[in-house]
Curated annotation (Swiss-Prot):
Signal sequence annotation: 1-25
UniProt name for this protein: Internalin J
Described function: Involved in several steps of L.monocytogenes infection, probably improves adhesin to host cells.
Region of interest: Disordered: 862-888
Gene for this chain: inlJ
A Pfam family reported for this protein in Swiss-Prot or TrEMBL: Int_EF-hand
Membrane topology: Peptidoglycan-anchor
InterPro entries recorded: CDIRP, Cu-Rt/internalin_Ig-like, InlJ_EF-hand, InlJ_Ig-like, LPXTG_anchor, LRR_dom_sf, MucBP_dom
Amino acid sequence: MKTSKIIIASLVSLTLVSNPILTFAATNDVIDSTTEITTDKEISSTQPTIKTTLKAGQTQSFNDWFPDDNFASEVAAAFEMQATDTISEEQLATLTSLDCHNSSIADMTGIEKLTGLTKLICTYNNITTLDLSQNTNLTYLACDSNKLTNLDVTPLTKLTYLNCDTNKLTKIDVSQNPLLTYLNCARNTLTEIDVSHNTQLTELDCHLNKKITKLDVTPQTQLTTLDCSFNKITALDVSQNKLLNRLNCDTNNITKLDLNQNIQLTFLNCSSNKLTEIDVTPLTQLTYFDCSVNPLTELDVSTLSKLTTLHCIQTDLLEIDLTHNTQLIYFQAEGCRKIKELDVTHNTQLYLLDCQAAGITELDLSQNPKLVYLYLNNTELTKLDVSHNTKLKSLSCVNAHIQDFSSVGKIPVLNNNLDAEGQTITMPKETLTNNSLTIAVSPDLLDQFGNPMNIEPGDGGVYDQATNTITWENLSTDNPAVTYTFTSENGAIVGTVTTPFEAPQPIKGEDVTVHYLDDKGEKLAADEVLSGNLDDPYTSSAKDIPDYTLTTTPDNATGTFTTTSQSVTYVYTKNIVAAEPVTVNYVDDTGKTLAPSETLNGNVGDTYNATAKQIDGYTLSTTPNNATGTFNTSSQTVTYVYTKNIVAAEPVTVNYVDDTGKTLAPSETLNGNVGDTYNATAKQIDGYTLSAEPTNATGQFTSSAQTVNYIYTKNPAPEKGVVEIHYVDENNKQLSSATKISGTVGDNYTTEPKNIDGYTLTTTPDNATGTFNTSSQTVTYVYTKNIVAAEPVTVNYVDANGKTLAPSETLNGTIGDTYNATAKQIDGYTLSAEPTNATGQFTNSAQTVNYIYTKNTNIDQPLPDKKTTKPSNLKTTEVKKASDTLPKTGDSTPWKSALLGVFLSSTALVIWKKKK
């Protein structure tokens, strides 16, 4: 019986060794009925079986497959093996997920062997290149925080997640990744990002590239998160992103942002742009909003009832209404100098309030019991009451104007967290008394404990603690202010009080009037009035008066202002000088002399008086302004103008007729006075020509009626000419429809060429301009087709999986030219189908022609290598996956060994039965 068992065991072993396929099937049976291996003993017991599952092909250690030791270790760990263990290429292809982040990897060579990968995480390494052309099953790729300068993901058509953040990429092509839902290419040096083919994106992050000037996300209708901050984008259209929940576009050059369609937004940061207005009233779900560092003057947040955070730092807002934002927790308006008032009494949930450098002068914090952080530096606040803010942990109000800090002491935690240096207080202006000034120290200067603060006078003042006053002596208005400082005991509060002062107002003296008269008491020049304070000196001065000499300088030419008005009189004598004559003329309104001129003579400064004359038939119409005046050193003319007495004349009738006497235009009637001149004028009458100018077209009105007749002759009908304009190429092919122009024979014509797309004018005809004549004329403009280099056509030779089988070809040409791509003969492959665009025309867009081949099927395959391999530490589940692969069609099977095994087994069974 024992011998029989040994024989049967030997036969079975021989059969299994002779037929590995049977061994593989047996292994599957074991795995299917076994749970996950948990003990060293179990692993050891399965190693011989795993060892037999290694497929035929190259087998070497992980260190051999992967030159980078750190990478080799990470891949080995994924198989729960050591880097020195051996593994086949087929087994490497079974790995589906690899996380080798933060492993100091510099070289990813060998990644191409992991063709089964669907997920790869290689973040936080020192990788400079990453070739994933063979990893076409990847759906998840995270390669951020490396040193990549180039990343080609075009073969990864199944990719749904891509994170290449924090590298050195200057470009990224995701046009072949239509399934992407997540894309993070932030912190690179991209100048553009085209996501027009990625319509499934829900998250896009391209911030901190600093060079992107435009971004089109209109195709991304599923987008929920967008971060394009820290770039140079000037315009952003999010009207099609109606599912957008988070938008961060800060630190760009955006001038306009329309958010009317983005009503699901909860987070919005558009700070540091160039927005002059923004409408957020439709965004009722918004909880976070930052519009800081924009030239905004208005902002309506009344509909944002869910808002918890609002930042409007360094804007030009004139006001901000927070009464509807009752959930507000964080509010910052730092640098908003134009905001003078702020009501936070409705914001009972406030945790942080920052109004530094705002223009507010008062602030009611009585309704903010949850306030923890309060920043009021560089404000115009003069009062502060935090007695209701018992949870305050930090208060800073440096460089304000606050005197009383007693409310702070009611919150013990603030005693060591109060910063109130640099307070400046300006008191009302005081008046000096004998160059001295005494002022009372402000009783409102109280520290956080309600105690008076320590006082230190400046500018040489003396402090009297008993009277709480400070006195300054010998003050000068050259420095018209005095100061003193105040300090709390713990030094948290420091400030300066400034009191401006002025000298007593002086008493005004009565005015001094200075007169300038001749020796007859006549005024020669305007008086001067001198003003000043009582007892101040005054000085008067004489004037230079033409033709007069000063003869008397008054004794009181200088003196002092008194309580009585004073007069100072300078007396002059006229100089005797013969003047030029004054000529008096008498003329009509045409300048014609009507009577002899008169000549008046005298001395410079003397008065002259001209008189009019009575002239028969004329009436004086103009009395000259200088009829009375003063003789001087220049000759003068006085002209009296007369008008002839008017006698109405009979009218002159002007007719416009043809040679038969037919009226062609309404008559004109000319009226005037007897002796006046009339001038009749001809009219332009369509279709007629004036025959002759009448002899009496010009004449004088008389006491008799007169008639002037303009006679016209009818014009003959004009003869017309035609010019036809053609637009052709150098082969006389018509490029545009011909046009015609017509006109009167003898008139000039001008033609113009047309702008024809794709063509340039080469010949302007000599007769482009000319004269219409009785014959039809032809003008022909000749054009030459433009030669424009087209974008290339790339011809690829690939298998059904997109794998390159032969080098691509590049076809070049001119736009409009025809291209012809050709297939290649590739050993072991057959062309599946001729691409539809194998022949076409070059255009201004790059084109791709793909020849797709099918691998030929080999009938005869070599027998598998029977060499044994080292035991594997693969998990049972992974061994099962590898063993599920059946022989491919055409693989040879060791049937002879199988039949021999069956025969021997049968023979042994018969012998055993006989012995039994």
